[in-house]
Amino acid sequence: MGVHPQLNKNGELQHLLTTEGLPAVILRHILDTAESFTGVTERDVKKIPLLRGKSVFNLFFEPSTRTRTTFEIAAKRLSADVINLNMAVSSQTKGETLLDTVDNLSAMHADMFIVRHNQSGAAHLIARHVRPEIHVINAGDGWHAHPTQALLDMFTIRRYKQDFHALRVAIIGDILHSRVARSQIHALTTLGVPEIRVIAPKTLLPAKVERLGVHVYHNMVQGLQDVDVLMMLRLQHERMESAHLPSTEEYFKYYGLTPEKLALARSDAIVMHPGPMNRGVEIDSEVADGTQSVILPQVNFGIAVRMAVMSILAGN
């Protein structure tokens, strides 16, 4: 492989593992390709033959409904054969190693692995291990990265705001446990967003988060002033220790997005959420269902973005 673990020797995308270090030209190419696929979802026949004859294996070692479903829909729209494996109850529980599992599936002529795992670095490990004709997409690994979520977020921002170069973007909530936040920050920076803010209590921020080039706020009143894009994050109770948080009610009081807090941002600001959403914890229903929310379009764009990634990896 080339200088970057995701690129081949020609500088083309070989795997999608993280947004960190991905060149802007590749990020833009994915977004442009996704734009060309949005029309497919509007057609009577929602299929194009770009992945016909290819086998795509969904390896989800962590539960997921939305991400797994959108990957499956995206692959099927490209005419791929999709094999869904519930890894949580399969060979892994019988003691087979991750790479043994991958070797066995590779022997079944897999062309692409879509991997979600609770261990950071799992997708990188698989990418280093597989034959060069097999492509790996990271669908979320531990606290580390979730690149396709960040890409669909970038696509959504570009749809509503056109240009990245004059935006103030705030990421609000459980930054500490969020692989989405890390991927968003890397993508926003690469695409030229001049000001990225993170707003969270100190207990929900990673150490030295400022090194990522973000402005840190612990207060919504200050942090939301003149913001163009609000990216809400859920509290990840499954990755959290009780010490991180007094109560969800108290969290909502200070960090939940209400109409009153949203009014501090720009009047044309958009509200995003990667899902699943906890109403009454990080976001008020009135905001989630309101005119500034783009949460449902985000989900829809996820299909086109994942189609784009798979299509580019397959050499189209």
Curated annotation (Swiss-Prot):
> What is its biological role?
Catalyzes the condensation of carbamoyl phosphate and aspartate to form carbamoyl aspartate and inorganic phosphate, the committed step in the de novo pyrimidine nucleotide biosynthesis pathway.
Kindly list the GO CC terms recorded for this protein: cytosol
Q: What is this protein called?
A: Aspartate carbamoyltransferase catalytic subunit
UniProt binding sites for carbamoyl phosphate: R66, T67, R116, H146, Q149, G275, P276
Q: What is its EC number?
A: 2.1.3.2
Keywords assigned: Pyrimidine biosynthesis, Transferase
Pathway membership, UniProt: Pyrimidine metabolism; UMP biosynthesis via de novo pathway; (S)-dihydroorotate from bicarbonate: step 2/3
Q: How does it assemble?
A: Heterododecamer (2C3:3R2) of six catalytic PyrB chains organized as two trimers (C3), and six regulatory PyrI chains organized as three dimers (R2).
Species: Nitrosomonas europaea (strain ATCC 19718 / CIP 103999 / KCTC 2705 / NBRC 14298)
What is a biological process (GO) this protein takes part in? amino acid metabolic process
Q: Which residues form a coiled coil?
A: none
Is this entry keyworded Oxidoreductase? no
Which family does the similarity line name?
Answer: Belongs to the aspartate/ornithine carbamoyltransferase superfamily. ATCase family.
Please provide an example of a Pfam family that matches this protein in its UniProt record.
Answer: OTCace_N
Which amino acid positions bind L-aspartate, per UniProt? K94, R179, R234
What is catalyzed by this enzyme? carbamoyl phosphate + L-aspartate = N-carbamoyl-L-aspartate + phosphate + H(+)
EC main group: transferase
Q: Name one GO molecular function term.
A: aspartate carbamoyltransferase activity
